[in-house]
Amino acid sequence: MYSLSPDLSFLSPMDVNHLSDENTAIEINNLCLNYGKTSALSNIEMRIPKGQVTAFIGPSGCGKSTLLRCINRMNDLVDNCKIKGSIKLFGDDIYHPDTDIPSLRRRVGMVFQRPNPFPKSIYENVVYGLRLQGIKEARVLDEAVEEALKAAALWDEVKHRLHENAFGLSGGQQQRLVIARAIAIEPEVLLLDEPTSALDPISTLTIEELIYELKSKYTVVIVTHNMQQAARVSDYTAFINQGKLVEYGNANTIFTSPIHKQTEDYITGRYG
């Protein structure tokens, strides 16, 4: 079972907005996003620490998934979407005109709400991104498959059926396969958009344990509507409401002694 008291020794609890560049994975400055005339995000300012799990929480429609999708520019695919401000990934401005979007998305992997394996074998799902990069050597691909599936805690369950269709896996196994597919290309950041909302409690626990393990190698940002889950898996938590960042800090502090009444009301179920 994973520990609920992660090592946060390099930060004091409320220093999250004063991180050094060295400890910062993602720096968001004055980020505003509009869909047409509708404001979805307003003046978001935050630094996300590397090698930690950061959770975005908030009521439905608050902007948390929109913010998550800004980190790998998925919102570029939305018509009439306008973005102002900046996001830096390890110092690189991802909204700079010269940014290569495919390269960015190799650096920032993403897993969505419902498992979405490709209609291919388990093996081909994992190597899909590697093949796109031009990697063809069988030995390299085989090693990458084993490493990614082990990292996703799936190897022992599928090692004898790698060439079977991925649709034959359970929902929880499919989601772990999707995570393996994302990490096979070795991203720096892994974005998880409500990754357990379509899963049963046992599969949810398995994914939560996996998230805790993944932070040893990746910076993880998760959107979840489940506050108990955010409290269990995150080192830092951001409460977002009506497109604004209300409060952001150490997860234990957010869930036990939040500064803002709005945060307290949401966490205690008085609204939202």
Curated annotation (Swiss-Prot):
This is Phosphate import ATP-binding protein PstB 2. NCBIfam families: 3a0107s01c2. SMART domains: AAA. It is found in: Cell inner membrane. The gene is pstB2. ATP binds at residues 58-65. Residues 26-267 form the ABC transporter domain. InterPro entries: AAA+_ATPase (IPR003593), ABC_transporter-like_ATP-bd (IPR003439), ABC_transporter-like_CS (IPR017871), P-loop_NTPase (IPR027417), PstB-like (IPR005670). Its EC number is 7.3.2.1. It is a peripheral membrane protein. SUPFAM superfamilies: P-loop containing nucleoside triphosphate hydrolases. The lineage of its organism: Bacteria, Pseudomonadati, Pseudomonadota, Gammaproteobacteria, Vibrionales. CDD domains: ABC_PstB_phosphate_transporter. It comes from the Bacteria. PANTHER family: ABC TRANSPORTER I FAMILY MEMBER 17, IRON EXPORT ATP-BINDING PROTEIN FETA-RELATED. The complex is composed of two ATP-binding proteins (PstB), two transmembrane proteins (PstC and PstA) and a solute-binding protein (PstS). Part of the ABC transporter complex PstSACB involved in phosphate import. Responsible for energy coupling to the transport system. Keywords: ATP-binding, Cell inner membrane, Cell membrane, Membrane, Nucleotide-binding, Phosphate transport, Translocase, Transport. One of its GO terms (cellular component) is plasma membrane. The keyword Transmembrane does not apply. Its main location: membrane. Belongs to the ABC transporter superfamily. Phosphate importer (TC 3.A.1.7) family. GO terms for molecular function: ATP binding; ATP hydrolysis activity; ATPase-coupled phosphate ion transmembrane transporter activity. It catalyses: phosphate(out) + ATP + H2O = ADP + 2 phosphate(in) + H(+). GO terms for biological process: phosphate ion transmembrane transport. It is an enzyme of class 7 (translocase).
